[in-house]
Amino acid sequence: MAKQDAIEMEGTVTESLPNAMFRVDLDNGFNVLAHISGKIRRNYIKILPGDRVKVELTPYDLTKGRITYRLRKK
C-alpha cells in the first residue's frame, strides 16, 4: 500500500485491547480496530481510552487501521 492511498481520519479511542490494539470511534460514526504505528511504539507514546487520534485506513478494508498520531488535549 502506497502512502498516498491511505485514508486518514480522526477519532476517539473507546477501548484498549490486548497486543496494542484499540477500538476507535471515527468522527463519521464508523468503528474500527486499530493498531499502533512503529514510531508511536518506538517513542513509548501511551494511548489511553478517551484520547483523540489520527487513524490511517486502507481503501481495501475500512474496518482496520493504524494509529499514526495522538492529538493533544485542549
From Swiss-Prot:
RNA-binding among keywords: yes
Alphabetized Pfam families for the sequence: eIF-1a
Start and end residues of each S1-like domain: 1-72
SMART domains per record: S1 (SM00316)
A single GO molecular function term of this UniProt record: translation initiation factor activity
GO cellular component: cytosol
Keywords carried by this UniProt record: Cytoplasm, Initiation factor, Protein biosynthesis, RNA-binding, rRNA-binding
Gene3D superfamilies recorded: Nucleic acid-binding proteins
Claim: Cytoplasm is one of the keywords in the record: yes
Top-rank taxon, per record: Bacteria
Signal peptide: none
Location of this chain's protein in the cell: Cytoplasm
SUPFAM superfamilies named among the record's database cross-references: Nucleic acid-binding proteins (SSF50249)
Main location: cytoplasm
Described purpose of this protein according to its UniProt entry: One of the essential components for the initiation of protein synthesis. Stabilizes the binding of IF-2 and IF-3 on the 30S subunit to which N-formylmethionyl-tRNA(fMet) subsequently binds. Helps modulate mRNA selection, yielding the 30S pre-initiation complex (PIC). Upon addition of the 50S ribosomal subunit IF-1, IF-2 and IF-3 are released leaving the mature 70S translation initiation complex.
Family: Belongs to the IF-1 family.
Subunit structure: Component of the 30S ribosomal translation pre-initiation complex which assembles on the 30S ribosome in the order IF-2 and IF-3, IF-1 and N-formylmethionyl-tRNA(fMet); mRNA recruitment can occur at any time during PIC assembly.
PANTHER family reported for this sequence: TRANSLATION INITIATION FACTOR IF-1, CHLOROPLASTIC
Protein name (database record): Translation initiation factor IF-1
Native source organism of the sequence: Acaryochloris marina (strain MBIC 11017)
